[in-house]
């Protein structure tokens, strides 16, 4: 028997690609530890465990990291109102460093010098996985089969993988594969590739799995009261049926359920990948969409104007850092700490209506709001002297007068 080349921890999904990669790694002489993260996807984890063992995995780890995902990754994104290129709420981007962190922990525990993944050589995920691994385990060696000529020249498409699976008794679904790829976690589901690569093609009606079609969703709204402390949601109450959740995971799952029922969170976009190409993606982010709108509202209600301008600039940088895979970079740690500081007084309750694919803010209250009802009232003068506005306007007009004087002289 030939000597092992070493131990590799494979980020395993149980699907065709990573099942073939598991067997291929064994062919190359590696001992393989399969690691499957429960990050909120719809998966038969015990069946995946049995499959990995049958394929020859030396050991199988199935790790439930859903709560860690919510509290350590999703909540900072909610605090930041993190959104990439104005539309994408970063579901996959947030999940990858969370998954890879646990993969590194397992590799260290098992004294494995290699980690591996099934991400393609054209996408963002390879970057997110590997930058996390190198940050947390600098001496690690990474095996990325879809970047290795000996692998991608051998497996040029799904038919080659299917043939290899048949040869090695790798069980594959008997139903035809959807003509697109899908990635699911607690935050969202993404769909891309296949027929969706033509940006003109409409999403087929049967594509969406997390959200109901808004056109056929309920005609009556759910009214939710969402409570925030330091910019983090701490309680949700359905005012109609009095359902209430305050634990992070249960709260997020409940928002997914309500938003999904009403068709909230669908987007179809073309985005810029970090490696330089544009790609078309369709996303369902139900709970994330509700929290984005609710947090945006309570933050505007409680935060100083100039402070919020700076925070918005940081939020854009934060979204780019997450998308590009730099969660564990010094600049991202710095931005996260600044955003966390900005949230100290972001506390209160937001009332939202969820209906027909939309989230409507109905009202808000906060113990430390900068909103002064008497000061802003049209009916009460309060401490504000309207005459003071004259000087304010004249000072601000100086610059405009000078600009237009210059424009006039140019003619």
Curated annotation (Swiss-Prot):
Where it sits in the cell: the answer is: Cytoplasm, Cytosol
Annotated positions binding L-aspartate: 120, 124-125
Q: What is its EC number?
A: 6.3.4.5
Alphabetical list of InterPro entries matching this protein = Arginosuc_syn_C (IPR048268), Arginosuc_syn_N (IPR048267), Arginosuc_synth (IPR001518), Arginosuc_synth_CS (IPR018223), Arginosuc_synth_type_1_subfam (IPR023434), AS_cat/multimer_dom_body (IPR024074), Rossmann-like_a/b/a_fold (IPR014729)
Q: Mainly resides where?
A: cytoplasm
The cross-references to Pfam families, in alphabetical order and at most eight, read:
Arginosuc_syn_C, Arginosuc_synth
Gene Ontology terms: cellular component: cytoplasm; cytosol
Q: Which UniProt keywords apply?
A: Amino-acid biosynthesis, Arginine biosynthesis, ATP-binding, Cytoplasm, Ligase, Nucleotide-binding, Phosphoprotein, Urea cycle
* GO terms classed as biological process: argininosuccinate metabolic process; L-arginine biosynthetic process; urea cycle
Q: What's this protein's function? A: One of the enzymes of the urea cycle, the metabolic pathway transforming neurotoxic amonia produced by protein catabolism into inocuous urea in the liver of ureotelic animals. Catalyzes the formation of arginosuccinate from aspartate, citrulline and ATP and together with ASL it is responsible for the biosynthesis of arginine in most body tissues.
> Which family is this sequence assigned to?
Belongs to the argininosuccinate synthase family.
UniProt protein name: Argininosuccinate synthase
* Protein's organism: Xenopus laevis
Provide the taxonomic classification: Eukaryota, Metazoa, Chordata, Craniata, Vertebrata
């Amino acid at each position: 028997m030939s000597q092992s080349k070493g131990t590799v921890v494979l980020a395993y999904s149980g699907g065709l690609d990573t099942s073939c990669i598991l067997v291929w790694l064994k062919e190359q002489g590696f001992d393989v530890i399969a690691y499957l993260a429960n990050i909120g996807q719809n998966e038969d984890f015990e069946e995946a465990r049995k499959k990995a063992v049958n394929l020859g995995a030396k050991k199988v780890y199935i790790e439930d990291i859903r709560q860690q995902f919510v509290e350590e990754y999703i909540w900072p994104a909610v605090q930041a109102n993190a959104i990439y290129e104005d539309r994408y709420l970063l579901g996959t981007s947030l999940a990858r460093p969370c998954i890879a962190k646990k993969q590194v922990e397992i590799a260290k525990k098992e004294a494995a010098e290699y980690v591996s993944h099934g991400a393609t050589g054209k996408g963002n995920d390879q970057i997110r996985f590997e930058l996390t691994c190198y940050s947390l385990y600098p001496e690690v060696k990474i095996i990325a089969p879809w970047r290795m000529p000996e692998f991608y020249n051998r497996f040029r498409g799904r038919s080659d993988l299917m043939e290899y699976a048949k040869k090695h008794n790798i069980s594959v679904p008997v139903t035809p594969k959807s003509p697109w790829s899908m990635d699911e976690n607690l935050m969202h589901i993404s769909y891309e590739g296949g027929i969706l690569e033509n940006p003109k093609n409409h999403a087929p009606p049967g594509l969406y799995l997390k959200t109901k079609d808004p056109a056929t969703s309920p005609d009556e709204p759910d009214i939710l009261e969402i409570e925030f402390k330091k910019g983090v949601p701490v309680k949700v109450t359905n005012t109609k049926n009095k359902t209430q959740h305050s634990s992070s995971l249960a709260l997020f799952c409940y928002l997914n359920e309500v938003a999904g029922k009403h068709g909230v969170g669908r987007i179809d976009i073309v985005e810029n990948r970090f490696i330089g190409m544009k790609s078309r993606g369709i996303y369902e982010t139900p709970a994330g969409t509700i929290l984005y709108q609710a947090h945006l509202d309570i933050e505007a209600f409680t935060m100083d104007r100039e402070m919020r301008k700076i925070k918005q600039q940081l939020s854009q940088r934060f979204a780019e850092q997450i998308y590009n895979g730099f969660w564990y970079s010094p600049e991202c740690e710095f931005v996260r700490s600044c955003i966390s500081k900005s949230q100290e007084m972001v506390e209160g309750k937001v009332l939202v209506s969820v209906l027909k694919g939309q989230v409507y803010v109905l009202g808000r209250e906060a113990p430390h709001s900068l909103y002064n009802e008497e000061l802003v009232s049209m009916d009460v003068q309060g401490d504000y002297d309207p005459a003071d506005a004259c000087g304010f306007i004249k000072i601000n007009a100086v610059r405009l007068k000078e600009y237009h004087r210059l424009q006039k002289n140019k003619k």
